[in-house]
């Protein structure tokens, strides 16, 4: 064989062998450098990365000082699963089953009967007044410390009815990565949820890295009093504030006092929050998670009992909001799925 041809073949083999060795390590290195590794390369991921780069680049017209970098996130259906029902509703159902043993007279009410008997048809058509009554019975007439313990004990043992995993494992890996990425870029991350503020506060820091003072949600009535000479906050019957739809911008103003520049939601209950955030001066970004993955999660939007998304889909384009397509955009949904 011609010596030059032989040398060329040797070089080709060496290069190919070197490529086989380096490819896995290069892929690993690239993945390690990717701040959102569970996101597929898509318009959604690109929009997030470009926006963050835009507002954090010093010396540019769109630079936003760290103290103004505020991002708000809905919780149910945006950060964790809301199917087959809101997690707080599952908490209410379990609480009712315990309460009726102590107070059998509660079974005189149809909503309580339906919970104990498992009448899903009735439960899917609960009136707002019945839901309020269930929340009051299961959340009120105790101190905030007592309620915190009840929530912590429940969240530590309760399991998702479909995945049979703790609810705290049923969080969306890509969204947790996003929270971490934003905080690394000096954003302050807030939860703005229609769920109960005191239901979320006991566990969100350990799951999302969001401290309790950065949680905004619906609130029940409370009162300060001395119990056995100990200063105590008591939970009372009655709803004080509903942090849903038009209540979300109000909650943001009450708790934060600044208009956020980033907003993430998944349902029509988040419409006004995204509308408020993206109407701000300067660069803003609003995004909606659309549940399109029937294999890894649940596909739903316009017809869902929980997390209905219809108006947001219709208006997203004209409002300039991005749609995050779960099936298309996420490489991984839950931590227990690979």
Please describe what each predicted stretch is.
Residues 1-13:
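Bacterial N-terminal signal peptides that target proteins for export
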Residues 10-25:
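Bacterial N-terminal signal peptides
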Residues 29-39, 43-49, 53, 68, ...:
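C-terminal cap/substrate-recognition subdomain and adjoining C-terminal extension
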Residues 51-70, 83-84:
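N-terminal carbohydrate-binding/catalytic regions of secreted carbohydrate-active enzymes
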Residues 69-84, 274:
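Asp-based phosphoryl-transfer active-site loop
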Residues 80-82, 122, 202, 213:
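Secretory-pathway/luminal and periplasmic proteins that interact with or process carbohydrate-rich
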Residues 82-85, 90-93, 202-203, 276:
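Short, solvent-exposed loop/turn and secondary-structure capping segments
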Residues 85, 90-169, 173:
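A metal-dependent, Asp-based hydrolase signature
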């Amino acid at each position: 064989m011609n010596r030059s041809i032989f040398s060329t073949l040797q070089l080709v083999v060496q290069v190919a062998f070197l490529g086989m060795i380096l490819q896995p390590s290069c892929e690993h290195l690239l993945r390690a450098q990717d701040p959102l590794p569970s996101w597929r390369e898509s318009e959604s991921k690109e929009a997030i990365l470009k926006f963050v780069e835009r507002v954090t680049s010093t010396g540019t017209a769109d630079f936003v000082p760290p103290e103004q970098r505020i991002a708000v996130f809905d919780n149910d259906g945006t950060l964790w699963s809301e199917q087959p029902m809101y997690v707080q509703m599952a908490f209410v159902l379990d609480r009712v089953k315990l309460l009726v043993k102590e107070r059998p007279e509660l079974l005189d009410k149809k909503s309580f009967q339906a919970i104990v008997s498992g009448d899903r048809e009735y439960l899917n058509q609960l009136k707002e007044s019945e839901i309020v009554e269930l929340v009051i019975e299961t959340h009120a007439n105790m101190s905030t410390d007592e309620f915190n313990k009840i929530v912590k004990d429940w969240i530590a043992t309760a399991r998702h009815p479909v995945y049979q995993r703790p609810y705290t494992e049923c969080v969306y890996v890509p969204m947790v990565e996003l929270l971490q990425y934003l905080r690394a870029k000096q954003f302050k991350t807030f939860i703005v949820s229609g769920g109960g503020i005191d239901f979320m506060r006991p566990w969100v820091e350990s799951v999302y890295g969001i401290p309790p003072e950065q949680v905004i949600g619906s609130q029940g009535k409370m009162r300060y009093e001395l119990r056995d000479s100990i200063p105590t906050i008591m939970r009372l019957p009655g709803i004080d504030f509903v942090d849903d739809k038009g209540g979300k911008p109000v909650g943001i103003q009450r708790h934060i006092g600044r208009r956020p520049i980033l907003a993430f939601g998944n349902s029509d209950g988040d419409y006004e929050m995204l509308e408020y955030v993206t109407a701000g001066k300067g660069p803003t970004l609003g995004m909606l998670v659309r549940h399109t993955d029937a294999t890894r999660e649940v596909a739903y939007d316009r017809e869902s009992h929980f997390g209905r998304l219809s108006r947001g889909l219709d208006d997203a384009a004209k409002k300039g909001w991005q749609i995050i397509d779960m099936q298309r955009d996420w490489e991984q949904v839950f931590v227990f799925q690979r």
